């Protein structure tokens, strides 16, 4: 609820009230876009933003699982951390574009460790696979033989994570 110009009253689940000049909500894996659509914020699979995390509405930003930044909807911890760092600087007067390096997602299970770095949806790739005694390595190669993504299964393959990640280009490069 808006209280005064720029102030919001927030009611917590336990009934406690807080007053804030800004509200940030980033919860859930599947974006609920109802509120955004009801306020004419542009949406696709998520809330559409530019690299400054700005929506089409003045002074409204989106981060987290709901933010679709330059067509990328990445509901993982690392992209959210990148967004939070950039938006914090922007809200403090230093416009900062979000930077997305190659960010593999690891599923940490002792029996079958799995790491996945999806290839960009707009890049044609062919998969090269290598069977290992305890798993496999699959690399998504573009038409110029560059690694654009990978899947690593098993402890032996997991050791390749850092070296393969360094070969994959940034999803959103650092602003110059």
PLM-predicted stretches and their roles:
Residues 20-21, 124, 160-162:
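Short acidic, gly/pro-rich beta-turn/loop elements at beta-sheet edges
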Residues 1-6:
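A conserved short coil-to-beta-strand element within the FAD-binding core of flavoproteins
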Residues 26-27, 153, 167:
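Residue-level recognition of phosphate/Mg2+-coordinating polar/acidic sites
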Residues 156-173:
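A short, polar/charged loop-to-alpha-helix boundary motif
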Residues 7-11, 16-89:
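FAD-site-proximal beta/loop scaffold in flavoenzymes
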Residues 66-158:
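Mid-to-C-terminal Rossmann-like scaffold of FAD/NAD(P)H-dependent oxidoreductases
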């Amino acid at each position: 609820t808006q209280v005064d110009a720029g102030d919001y009253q927030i009611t917590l689940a336990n009934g406690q009230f807080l007053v804030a000049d800004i509200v940030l909500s980033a919860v859930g894996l599947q974006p609920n876009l109802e509120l955004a659509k009801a306020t004419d914020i542009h949406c696709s699979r998520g809330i559409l933003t530019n690299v400054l995390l700005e929506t089409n509405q003045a002074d409204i930003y989106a981060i987290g699982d709901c933010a679709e930044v330059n067509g990328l909807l990445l509901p993982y911890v690392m992209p959210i951390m990148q967004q939070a760092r950039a938006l914090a600087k922007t809200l403090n007067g230093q416009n900062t574009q979000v930077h997305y390096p190659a960010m593999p997602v690891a599923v940490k299970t002792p029996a079958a460790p799995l790491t996945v770095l999806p290839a960009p949806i707009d890049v044609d790739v062919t998969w090269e696979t290598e069977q290992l005694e305890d798993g496999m390595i699959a690399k998504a190669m573009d038409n110029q033989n560059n690694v654009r993504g990978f899947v690593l299964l098993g402890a032996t393959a997991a050791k390749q994570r850092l070296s393969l990640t360094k070969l994959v280009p940034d999803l959103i490069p650092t602003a110059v």
